[in-house]
From Swiss-Prot:
Residues 225-293 form the SH3 domain. Its main location: other. Phosphorylated by SRC. The modification Phosphoserine is found at S42, S121. GO terms for molecular function: structural constituent of postsynaptic density; transmembrane transporter binding. Can homomultimerise. Interacts with CACNG2. Interacts (via the SH3-Guanylate kinase-like sub-module) with DLG4/PSD95 and DLGAP1/GKAP. Interacts (via the PDZ domain) with CADM1 (via C-terminus). Interacts with KCNN2/SK2 (via N-terminal domain). Interacts with SRC. Disulfide bonds: none annotated. Residues 140-219 form the PDZ domain. SUPFAM superfamilies: L27 domain, P-loop containing nucleoside triphosphate hydrolases, PDZ domain-like, SH3-domain. GO terms for cellular component: cytoplasm; cytoskeleton; dendrite membrane; dendritic shaft; dendritic spine; glutamatergic synapse; postsynaptic density; postsynaptic density membrane. This is MAGUK p55 subfamily member 2. GO terms for biological process: excitatory postsynaptic potential; long-term synaptic potentiation; protein homooligomerization. The gene is Mpp2.
Length: 552
């Protein structure tokens, strides 16, 4: 084996030490290098490298595979010497011993590879499930449990028999490894089980102490699933789900929770567990939940119309719309949000910080405070406008000035993240401006409309999205009064303005909450700013969960 490969630890460390020079040499993206470092530093990968090193070691080969013939030649040569030397006689006696002869015979068989592997056990034909079972095919499995304890297994009826449908990851049965999917349950504590899955579940749940199961093994080979992690975008309570095959085996979760999917064999029900730990449970699959949420009423509703004959129908046609980016908020309201596949990344700095919130909630104040606090680390874009510059204004200081025709052409070409018109003039944020701030090595801080997050949420911008939530009405009014008294603000908000801010904040949270990485209630600007600082520092020291599309 080559010397350079004898020490996998030093070889991997050498790769890690040289990752910093890869961007210049290969043009690799920063996010790809972060992902590569996370893989290289993973204990699993290091263990695999050690295993590979062991497997690649020089294999021992037999010198010869006819040692029995060689021993016979030696014995013939020793025949004459044995009469003259006691040592030769002892050697001849050892070489002729049955145990030594068997050892040499076994060695020669292995060296010449003349051995045969026995054929695998054939699977059982389900068509014979109702025929008498040979006594040697039945197994007895013993389980100790307490009353009310769930075994972590569900059943189905197949050919009149109760068959194990699924084994929940992390449950009692999965940990013991004595039962497998497809096993047929014949008896429980000597009593036939019948053909009712719910009755069997209740019998097993109420049993305590030693439970003896008579089973007919399935001989199915289990397969190892790939690791899948998802972020949930809805709340789920199995106790309230009428479709659940086993409410006790369900897993409860809330929107924003991170789950590991451990089994997806069933098209409608997956097995999952919380990434923080705990036993696995059943959750509705992506397909099942999409069907449930997409269920709509029939086109014709049986509602009587005045002035018509009895029994006539009032028809309601479905509204058809062509997708327009200018009206994407309408489509966002009808987007089905179930699960989002995510991946765990080592600590890294996000390229953009996106502040989302209602108008007047304090986004711009937080952005300005963050840039003033660390201008070498944070920056922002200069907005573009089609209005003419004032005498005191300079290009790039406050605004970048372009003609209306040029700006309209760039808007049609999709070069603006967002844009609007005020008093006959266009204003907007160019996407290239964001790229420029990121290229300078700074985090680009943006306070944009919620619709813009869909454009930014890519591997190019890897945004950290923070929702600045409005406090309750009374707190918001007190904050505005304090800002007026301290001279921080000169605009007094009316009662309608305050209520509008609170209502808009709630609408944004309902419609775009699945995009938020963090939510901060801005009831005190200084406290909210400190919480934002802390969150940004954690990104540099703690692992992060990001959409899997950013990684692969």
């Amino acid at each position: 084996m080559p010397v350079a490969a004898t020490n996998s630890e030093s070889a991997m460390q050498q790769v890690l030490d040289n990752l910093g020079s890869l961007p210049n040499a290969t043009g690799a993206a920063e996010l790809d290098l972060i992902f590569l470092r996370g893989i290289m530093e993973s204990p699993i990968v290091r263990s695999l490298a050690k295993a590979h090193e062991r497997l690649e070691e020089t294999k021992l080969e037999a010198v010869r595979d006819n040692n029995l013939e060689l021993v016979q030649e030696i014995l013939r040569d020793l025949a004459e010497l044995a009469e003259q030397s006691s040592t030769a006689a002892e050697l001849a006696r050892i070489l002729q011993e049955p145990h030594f002869q068997s050892l040499l015979e076994t060695h020669d068989s292995v060296a010449s590879k003349t051995y045969e592997t026995p054929p695998p056990s054939p699977g059982l034909d389900p068509t014979f499930s109702n025929q008498p079972v040979p006594p040697d095919a039945v197994r007895m499995v013993g389980i100790r449990k307490t009353a009310g304890e769930h075994l972590g297994v569900t059943f189905r009826v197949e050919g009149g028999e109760l068959v194990i449908a699924r084994i929940l990851h992390g449950g009692m049965v999965a940990q013991q490894g004595l039962l497998h999917v497809g096993d047929i349950i014949k008896e429980v504590n000597g009593q036939p089980v019948g053909s009712d899955p719910r009755a069997l579940q209740e019998l097993l749940r109420s049993a305590s102490g030693s439970v003896i199961l008579k089973i007919l093994p399935s001989y199915q080979e289990p397969h190892l699933p790939r690791q899948v992690f998802v972020k949930c975008h809805f709340d789920y309570d199995p106790a309230r789900d009428s479709l659940s095959p086993c409410k006790e085996a369900g897993l409860r979760f809330n929107a924003g929770d991170l789950l590991q999917i451990v089994n997806q064999d069933d098209a409608n029900w997956w097995q999952a567990c919380h990434v923080e730990g705990g036993s696995a449970g059943l959750i509705p699959s992506q397909l099942l939940e999409e069907k449930r949420k997409a269920f709509v009423k029939r086109d014709l509703e049986l509602t009587p119309t005045s002035g018509t004959l009895c029994g006539s129908l009032s028809g309601k046609k479905k509204k058809r719309m062509m997708y327009l980016t200018t009206k994407n908020a309408e489509f966002d309201r009808h987007e089905l949000l179930i699960y989002e596949e995510v991946a765990r990344m080592p600590p890294f700095r996000r390229k953009t910080l996106v502040l989302i919130g209602a108008q007047g909630v304090g986004r711009r104040s937080l952005k300005n405070k963050l840039i003033l606090w660390d201008p070498d680390r944070y920056g922002t874009t200069v907005p573009y406008t089609s209005r003419r510059p004032k005498d005191s204004e300079r290009e790039g200081q406050g605004y970048s000035f372009v003609s209306r025709g040029e700006m309209e052409a760039d808007i049609r070409a999709g070069r603006y993240l967002e844009h609007g018109e005020y008093e006959g003039n266009l204003y907007g944020t160019r996407i290239d401006s964001i790229r420029g701030v990121v290229a300078s090595g700074k985090v680009c801080v943006l306070d944009v409309n919620p619709q813009a997050v869909k454009v930014l949420r890519t591997a190019e911008f890897v945004p950290y999205v923070v929702f600045i939530e409005a406090p309750d009405y009374e707190t918001l009014r007190a904050m505005n009064r304090a800002a007026l008294e301290s001279g921080v603000s000169t605009k007094q908000l009316t009662e309608a303005d305050l209520r509008r801010t609170v209502e808009e904040s709630s609408r944004i949270q309902r419609g775009y909450g699945h995009y938020f990485d963090l939510s901060l209630v801005n009831s005190n600007l200084e406290r909210t700013f400190r919480e934002l600082q802390t969150a940004m520092e954690k990104l540099r020291t703690e692992p992060q969960w990001v959409p899997v599309s950013w990684v692969y």
